[in-house]
Design a protein with these regions (language model features):
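Bacterial N-terminal signal peptides that target proteins for export
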Residues: 1-9
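C-terminal motif of bacterial Sec signal peptides marking the signal peptidase cleavage site
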Residues: 15-17
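Short, well-ordered, aromatic-rich surface patches in folded extracellular/luminal domains
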Residues: 20, 30-62, 66, 123-317
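Short, flexible N-terminal segments of the mature chain
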Residues: 66-87
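A short, structured loop/turn motif at beta-sheet edges
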Residues: 78-79, 106-110, 146-152
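Acidic/histidine-rich, surface-exposed loop or edge segments in extracytoplasmic proteins
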Residues: 86-100
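Second-shell loop/turn segments in exported
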Residues: 97-104, 131
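Short, internal acidic amphipathic alpha-helical interface segments
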Residues: 108-132
Protein backbone atom coordinates (compact mmCIF):
# COMPACT_ATOMS: atom_id res chain seq x y z
CA UNK A 1 0.00 0.00 0.00
CA UNK A 2 1.31 3.42 -0.91
CA UNK A 3 2.05 5.62 2.08
CA UNK A 4 2.82 9.32 2.13
CA UNK A 5 3.93 11.81 4.71
CA UNK A 6 1.01 12.16 7.13
CA UNK A 7 -1.51 14.92 6.76
CA UNK A 8 -0.44 16.27 3.37
CA UNK A 9 -2.75 17.54 0.66
CA UNK A 10 -1.95 18.55 -2.87
CA UNK A 11 -1.68 22.32 -2.67
CA UNK A 12 -2.51 23.60 -6.12
CA UNK A 13 -4.79 26.15 -4.45
CA UNK A 14 -1.91 27.32 -2.27
CA UNK A 15 0.37 27.64 -5.25
CA UNK A 16 -2.28 29.61 -7.13
CA UNK A 17 -2.67 31.96 -4.17
CA UNK A 18 1.09 32.47 -3.89
CA UNK A 19 1.42 33.18 -7.60
CA UNK A 20 -1.56 35.52 -7.66
CA UNK A 21 -0.47 37.62 -4.69
CA UNK A 22 3.31 37.51 -5.02
CA UNK A 23 3.83 35.46 -1.86
CA UNK A 24 6.54 33.42 -3.52
CA UNK A 25 7.55 31.94 -6.84
CA UNK A 26 5.63 28.84 -7.81
CA UNK A 27 5.61 26.60 -10.84
CA UNK A 28 3.20 24.12 -12.28
CA UNK A 29 2.76 20.59 -11.02
CA UNK A 30 6.00 18.63 -11.46
CA UNK A 31 6.30 16.37 -14.49
CA UNK A 32 6.19 12.62 -14.00
CA UNK A 33 9.87 11.84 -14.40
CA UNK A 34 11.05 8.33 -13.62
CA UNK A 35 13.82 5.86 -14.21
CA UNK A 36 15.78 6.55 -11.06
CA UNK A 37 18.12 4.29 -9.18
CA UNK A 38 16.75 0.85 -8.37
CA UNK A 39 13.12 1.46 -9.43
CA UNK A 40 12.04 2.05 -13.02
CA UNK A 41 8.70 3.40 -11.81
CA UNK A 42 10.16 5.62 -9.13
CA UNK A 43 11.33 9.19 -8.84
CA UNK A 44 14.85 9.69 -10.16
CA UNK A 45 17.38 10.72 -7.53
CA UNK A 46 21.15 10.92 -6.93
CA UNK A 47 23.08 7.89 -5.74
CA UNK A 48 26.03 7.26 -3.43
CA UNK A 49 26.95 10.04 -1.04
CA UNK A 50 25.23 12.79 -3.00
CA UNK A 51 22.34 14.36 -1.12
CA UNK A 52 18.74 13.84 -2.18
CA UNK A 53 17.09 15.96 0.50
CA UNK A 54 18.61 18.24 3.13
CA UNK A 55 16.83 20.28 5.79
CA UNK A 56 19.14 22.94 7.14
CA UNK A 57 18.95 26.13 9.16
CA UNK A 58 20.60 29.43 8.30
CA UNK A 59 20.61 32.93 9.68
CA UNK A 60 19.08 33.91 12.98
CA UNK A 61 20.65 35.97 15.73
CA UNK A 62 23.35 33.49 16.76
CA UNK A 63 27.05 33.72 17.67
CA UNK A 64 29.57 33.01 14.93
CA UNK A 65 30.73 29.91 16.83
CA UNK A 66 27.22 28.46 16.56
CA UNK A 67 26.99 29.45 12.92
CA UNK A 68 30.23 27.62 12.12
CA UNK A 69 29.29 24.37 13.83
CA UNK A 70 25.58 24.23 13.00
CA UNK A 71 24.49 20.93 11.43
CA UNK A 72 21.60 20.04 9.13
CA UNK A 73 18.56 18.69 10.93
CA UNK A 74 17.97 16.03 8.28
CA UNK A 75 19.97 14.53 5.41
CA UNK A 76 18.86 11.82 2.98
CA UNK A 77 21.71 10.51 0.83
CA UNK A 78 21.58 8.71 -2.50
CA UNK A 79 22.63 5.43 -0.89
CA UNK A 80 19.60 5.58 1.40
CA UNK A 81 21.34 6.74 4.54
CA UNK A 82 19.40 9.16 6.71
CA UNK A 83 21.54 11.26 9.06
CA UNK A 84 19.91 13.43 11.67
CA UNK A 85 20.40 14.79 15.15
CA UNK A 86 19.56 12.37 17.94
CA UNK A 87 18.39 12.96 21.47
CA UNK A 88 20.41 15.39 23.55
CA UNK A 89 21.42 14.40 27.08
CA UNK A 90 20.69 16.58 30.11
CA UNK A 91 24.06 15.99 31.74
CA UNK A 92 26.35 18.92 32.54
CA UNK A 93 28.71 19.50 30.98
CA UNK A 94 27.37 17.92 27.81
CA UNK A 95 29.39 15.77 25.41
CA UNK A 96 31.80 17.51 23.06
CA UNK A 97 30.34 15.85 19.96
CA UNK A 98 26.76 16.29 18.74
CA UNK A 99 24.56 13.21 18.96
CA UNK A 100 24.26 12.36 15.27
CA UNK A 101 22.47 9.16 14.28
CA UNK A 102 22.02 7.29 11.01
CA UNK A 103 19.84 4.59 9.51
CA UNK A 104 19.50 3.31 5.95
CA UNK A 105 16.36 3.30 3.83
CA UNK A 106 15.66 0.80 1.08
CA UNK A 107 14.84 2.12 -2.38
CA UNK A 108 11.19 1.65 -1.44
CA UNK A 109 11.76 3.87 1.58
CA UNK A 110 13.46 6.55 -0.49
CA UNK A 111 10.51 6.54 -2.88
CA UNK A 112 8.03 6.81 0.02
CA UNK A 113 9.80 9.93 1.26
CA UNK A 114 10.13 11.48 -2.18
CA UNK A 115 6.47 10.81 -2.97
CA UNK A 116 5.46 12.64 0.18
CA UNK A 117 7.68 15.59 -0.68
CA UNK A 118 6.40 15.76 -4.25
CA UNK A 119 2.77 15.61 -3.13
CA UNK A 120 3.13 18.85 -1.21
CA UNK A 121 3.19 20.49 -4.64
CA UNK A 122 5.67 23.08 -3.42
CA UNK A 123 8.94 21.76 -4.83
CA UNK A 124 8.56 23.03 -8.38
CA UNK A 125 10.86 26.06 -8.28
CA UNK A 126 13.18 27.89 -5.89
CA UNK A 127 11.18 29.94 -3.38
CA UNK A 128 12.04 32.34 -0.56
CA UNK A 129 9.22 32.88 1.92
CA UNK A 130 10.13 35.81 4.16
CA UNK A 131 6.75 37.23 5.10
CA UNK A 132 7.12 36.16 8.74
CA UNK A 133 9.87 38.76 9.14
CA UNK A 134 7.03 41.22 9.73
CA UNK A 135 5.96 39.39 12.90
CA UNK A 136 9.07 37.59 14.21
CA UNK A 137 12.52 39.12 14.72
CA UNK A 138 15.89 37.35 14.54
CA UNK A 139 14.45 33.96 13.56
CA UNK A 140 16.30 31.44 11.42
CA UNK A 141 15.50 30.31 7.89
CA UNK A 142 14.65 26.65 7.44
CA UNK A 143 16.04 25.58 4.08
CA UNK A 144 14.78 22.51 2.22
CA UNK A 145 17.06 21.43 -0.64
CA UNK A 146 15.73 18.70 -2.93
CA UNK A 147 17.54 16.98 -5.80
CA UNK A 148 15.10 14.60 -7.47
CA UNK A 149 13.15 14.02 -10.68
CA UNK A 150 15.84 15.84 -12.62
CA UNK A 151 15.44 19.06 -10.64
CA UNK A 152 17.34 20.83 -7.89
CA UNK A 153 14.96 22.97 -5.84
CA UNK A 154 15.58 25.07 -2.74
CA UNK A 155 12.80 26.42 -0.53
CA UNK A 156 13.80 28.83 2.22
CA UNK A 157 11.17 29.77 4.80
CA UNK A 158 11.72 32.30 7.56
CA UNK A 159 10.46 31.56 11.07
CA UNK A 160 9.05 28.09 10.40
CA UNK A 161 6.84 27.14 13.34
CA UNK A 162 6.13 30.74 14.33
CA UNK A 163 3.04 31.20 12.16
CA UNK A 164 -0.17 29.57 13.49
CA UNK A 165 -1.81 27.62 10.65
CA UNK A 166 -5.25 29.13 11.24
CA UNK A 167 -4.21 32.77 11.60
CA UNK A 168 -5.32 35.56 9.32
CA UNK A 169 -2.43 36.68 7.11
CA UNK A 170 -0.54 39.52 8.82
CA UNK A 171 0.67 42.54 6.85
CA UNK A 172 3.28 41.52 4.30
CA UNK A 173 2.21 37.87 4.19
CA UNK A 174 -0.25 36.25 1.80
CA UNK A 175 -2.74 33.52 2.66
CA UNK A 176 -0.73 31.27 0.36
CA UNK A 177 2.39 31.82 2.44
CA UNK A 178 0.49 31.06 5.66
CA UNK A 179 -0.59 27.76 4.10
CA UNK A 180 2.99 27.09 2.96
CA UNK A 181 4.07 27.49 6.61
CA UNK A 182 1.52 24.85 7.58
CA UNK A 183 2.53 22.41 4.85
CA UNK A 184 6.29 22.82 5.31
CA UNK A 185 5.86 22.53 9.07
CA UNK A 186 4.07 19.21 8.56
CA UNK A 187 6.75 18.10 6.13
CA UNK A 188 9.48 18.97 8.60
CA UNK A 189 7.70 17.11 11.41
CA UNK A 190 7.22 14.06 9.19
CA UNK A 191 10.88 13.93 8.22
CA UNK A 192 11.96 14.11 11.85
CA UNK A 193 9.69 11.18 12.77
CA UNK A 194 10.14 8.74 9.88
CA UNK A 195 9.77 5.77 12.22
CA UNK A 196 6.20 6.79 13.04
CA UNK A 197 4.84 6.36 9.52
CA UNK A 198 7.25 4.42 7.30
CA UNK A 199 6.64 0.64 7.11
CA UNK A 200 9.33 -1.76 8.31
CA UNK A 201 10.02 -2.74 4.69
CA UNK A 202 11.19 0.82 4.03
CA UNK A 203 14.26 0.28 6.18
CA UNK A 204 17.37 -1.67 5.27
CA UNK A 205 18.59 -1.63 8.87
CA UNK A 206 16.62 -2.32 12.04
CA UNK A 207 17.54 0.62 14.20
CA UNK A 208 19.35 3.93 14.43
CA UNK A 209 23.10 3.85 15.01
CA UNK A 210 25.56 6.58 16.05
CA UNK A 211 27.02 8.35 13.05
CA UNK A 212 30.83 8.25 12.93
CA UNK A 213 32.21 10.89 10.57
CA UNK A 214 35.14 10.23 8.28
CA UNK A 215 36.28 13.84 8.71
CA UNK A 216 35.78 16.70 11.14
CA UNK A 217 36.46 20.41 11.17
CA UNK A 218 38.22 21.43 14.36
CA UNK A 219 37.95 24.98 15.67
CA UNK A 220 40.92 25.54 17.97
CA UNK A 221 41.45 28.57 20.20
CA UNK A 222 44.26 29.46 22.62
CA UNK A 223 42.61 30.21 25.98
CA UNK A 224 45.78 30.17 28.08
CA UNK A 225 45.37 33.76 29.27
CA UNK A 226 41.61 33.62 29.75
CA UNK A 227 39.99 33.08 33.16
CA UNK A 228 38.59 29.58 33.74
CA UNK A 229 35.01 29.04 32.66
CA UNK A 230 32.59 28.57 35.54
CA UNK A 231 32.01 24.85 35.65
CA UNK A 232 29.48 24.86 38.45
CA UNK A 233 32.08 23.72 40.96
CA UNK A 234 33.37 20.89 38.78
CA UNK A 235 37.15 20.48 38.49
CA UNK A 236 38.84 21.64 35.31
CA UNK A 237 39.01 18.88 32.72
CA UNK A 238 42.30 19.04 30.79
CA UNK A 239 43.53 16.43 28.32
CA UNK A 240 46.80 16.04 26.48
CA UNK A 241 46.84 17.29 22.90
CA UNK A 242 46.70 13.92 21.09
CA UNK A 243 48.90 14.64 18.07
CA UNK A 244 52.44 15.91 17.48
CA UNK A 245 51.51 19.18 15.76
CA UNK A 246 51.56 22.57 17.47
CA UNK A 247 48.04 23.52 18.63
CA UNK A 248 48.85 27.21 18.21
CA UNK A 249 49.58 26.66 14.51
CA UNK A 250 46.72 24.27 13.78
CA UNK A 251 44.83 25.01 10.56
CA UNK A 252 44.22 28.60 9.48
CA UNK A 253 42.92 31.57 11.41
CA UNK A 254 39.21 32.31 11.07
CA UNK A 255 39.22 36.10 10.97
CA UNK A 256 35.43 36.31 11.22
CA UNK A 257 35.59 34.89 14.76
CA UNK A 258 37.67 37.82 15.97
CA UNK A 259 39.30 35.85 18.80
CA UNK A 260 42.16 33.97 17.16
CA UNK A 261 40.17 30.80 16.46
CA UNK A 262 41.80 28.57 13.86
CA UNK A 263 40.09 25.92 11.73
CA UNK A 264 41.51 22.79 10.17
CA UNK A 265 40.18 19.49 8.83
CA UNK A 266 41.17 16.09 10.19
CA UNK A 267 40.46 12.85 8.34
CA UNK A 268 41.95 9.39 7.86
CA UNK A 269 44.00 8.19 10.83
CA UNK A 270 44.16 11.72 12.20
CA UNK A 271 40.40 11.98 11.97
CA UNK A 272 39.98 8.67 13.80
CA UNK A 273 42.34 9.86 16.54
CA UNK A 274 40.40 13.07 17.02
CA UNK A 275 37.03 11.33 16.89
CA UNK A 276 38.13 9.08 19.75
CA UNK A 277 39.53 12.10 21.59
CA UNK A 278 36.39 14.21 21.21
CA UNK A 279 34.19 11.24 22.14
CA UNK A 280 35.93 11.19 25.52
CA UNK A 281 35.63 14.96 26.04
CA UNK A 282 32.92 17.32 27.24
CA UNK A 283 31.96 20.82 26.17
CA UNK A 284 34.24 22.18 28.91
CA UNK A 285 37.32 20.06 28.16
CA UNK A 286 40.55 21.89 27.40
CA UNK A 287 43.73 20.53 25.86
CA UNK A 288 47.38 21.19 26.69
CA UNK A 289 50.64 20.25 25.00
CA UNK A 290 53.06 21.32 27.71
CA UNK A 291 51.07 21.57 30.93
CA UNK A 292 50.86 25.36 30.75
CA UNK A 293 49.14 26.31 27.52
CA UNK A 294 45.40 25.68 27.26
CA UNK A 295 43.35 25.26 24.08
CA UNK A 296 39.65 24.85 23.50
CA UNK A 297 38.57 22.59 20.64
CA UNK A 298 35.13 22.50 19.07
CA UNK A 299 34.48 19.77 16.50
CA UNK A 300 32.02 19.95 13.64
CA UNK A 301 31.53 16.52 12.01
CA UNK A 302 31.58 16.61 8.21
CA UNK A 303 28.66 14.81 6.58
CA UNK A 304 29.24 12.63 3.49
CA UNK A 305 27.73 15.09 0.99
CA UNK A 306 29.63 18.11 2.31
CA UNK A 307 32.88 19.73 1.25
CA UNK A 308 35.14 19.09 4.25
CA UNK A 309 37.04 22.38 3.90
CA UNK A 310 36.49 25.04 6.55
CA UNK A 311 33.86 27.38 5.07
CA UNK A 312 34.31 31.08 4.49
CA UNK A 313 32.14 32.71 7.16
CA UNK A 314 32.60 36.39 6.34
CA UNK A 315 29.23 37.85 5.43
CA UNK A 316 27.39 34.70 6.46
CA UNK A 317 23.87 35.07 7.73
Amino acid sequence: MKRTLPGYLVVLLVLTACAATGGGSAGTSPPDESGGSGDSDGIEHPTGTDAILVVDSTGGFVPVQFMATRLPAFVLLGDGRVIMQGAQTLEFPGPALPALIERTLTEEGIQEVLSGVEETGLFTADVELNGAQNMVADAANTVFTLDAAGREVTISIYGLGAVPPDMEPPPGMTSGEVQAHRILGQLNDGLMTLDSWLPASAWETEGWQPYEPEAMRLYVRDVTDEPPVDGGGLPEHVREWPTEDDPAAFGDEEVFFGDGTRCGVVDGELGATWFEEMSAATQMTLWTDDGDRRFSVVARPVLPHEDPACPELAGAA
